Regions:
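Short, low-complexity cationic-aromatic patches
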Residues: 19-22, 60-64, 168-171, 213-217, ...
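Accessory, usually C-terminal, subdomains that scaffold auxiliary metal cofactors
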Residues: 9, 155, 198-201, 206, ...
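Hydrophobic beta-strand-centered segment that forms part of the acyl-chain substrate-binding groove
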Residues: 32-74, 184-227
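Hot-dog-fold acyl-thioester-processing enzymes
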Residues: 1-42, 148-197
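Residues that cap or initiate secondary-structure elements
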Residues: 7, 60, 77, 149-151, ...
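HotDog/MaoC-like acyl-thioester-processing domains
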Residues: 70-122, 219-264
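Short strand-loop-strand
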Residues: 12, 16, 135, 204-206
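Non-catalytic linker/capping segments at the edges of enzyme domains
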Residues: 1-12, 87-169, 237
Length: 264
């Protein structure tokens, strides 16, 4: 696994060694599922991600040259499907809903990761966000988000999970935006600068998608609430709980941590 140069930086802009991300922990089991279903001779195009549960290891996984993926796939043609296992040292559960299409067949070669939504096509959307309002009493931040499709690639074919809705928002789009919103609501609630927060890292995330994927381009809103921010140790380690709801029907609950005053 490789990340582009400058993928991970500190608050001061200094480069850091990248580590396995929560986005990878969602994507890799779905890539496995796409391959399994392809080998069975069916299409998962109308199968969507309904929920995901991620639990991190005690330390970040930094050996990106060797990321073990162990996934168990359980379900039937009508769905739902459950993917359970580990990615690196993260424990992962993904629930997929929707029926397979046994009449639309693809070869294993056609479902190479880069040809699927979660294998690579999800990168063809970009989201810009605008902070609309902060409510200090409830520690809630409201944001407006605009997700666009790369017009140069709009005709590019893709297969795999959620390809029937393409181009559309994926849970990856939501996780990326929610991470940014979490950083902002913590900074606003504690009257601290982003730089003084150091690195914010995930300890546990639960994401639920109540509706079918929202087709892009789309404008949507979210509400991010800081439920808890308490200092655990004298070195500035903070334990954080946040929850978020979006107009797209996606909700996120997360346990996070950061060390106040750390910049790397």
């Amino acid at each position: 696994m490789r990340y582009p140069a400058g993928w991970s930086t500190g608050a001061d802009g200094a480069l850091r060694n990248p580590h396995l991300s929560t986005l990878d922990a969602v994507v890799l089991p779905i890539i496995v599922f796409d391959r399994v279903i392809s080998e069975l001779g069916s299409s998962p195009g109308r199968v969507r991600v309904a929920a995901a549960r991620l639990r991190s290891g005690a330390v970040a996984w930094t050996d990106l040259a060797s990321v073990p993926v162990a996934v168990s796939v359980n379900g039937d043609e009508a769905g739902p499907w459950e993917l359970t296992g580990t990615v690196g040292n993260m424990r992962v559960f993904v629930r997929l809903e929707g029926a397979l299409d046994p009449h639309k067949r693809h070869t294993v070669a056609s479902l190479a990761p880069a040809a699927t939504v979660y294998g690579g096509a999800f990168r063809q959307t970009t989201t810009s966000s605008r902070l609309m309002r902060f409510e200090p009493e409830s520690r809630t931040l409201i944001g407006e988000h605009r997700t666009k499709w790369d017009a140069k690639r709009i005709r590019t074919e893709a297969e795999g999970v959620e390809s029937a809705w393409r181009p559309a928002l994926t849970v990856i789009d939501h996780l990326a935006v929610m991470g940014q919103m979490a950083q902002s609501v913590i900074a606003l609630s504690t009257d601290a600068s982003r730089e003084s927060m150091g690195t914010l890292w995930m300890r546990a995330i639960d994401i639920d998608a109540a509706e079918e994927p929202t087709v892009a381009p789309a404008t949507w809103t979210s509400r991010m609430t800081l439920l808890r921010d308490r200092e655990l140790r004298s070195d500035g380690l903070h334990d954080v709980r946040v929850q978020s709801t979006a107009s797209t029907g996606v909700s996120v609950r997360a346990s996070l941590a950061y060390t106040k005053g750390a910049s790397s």
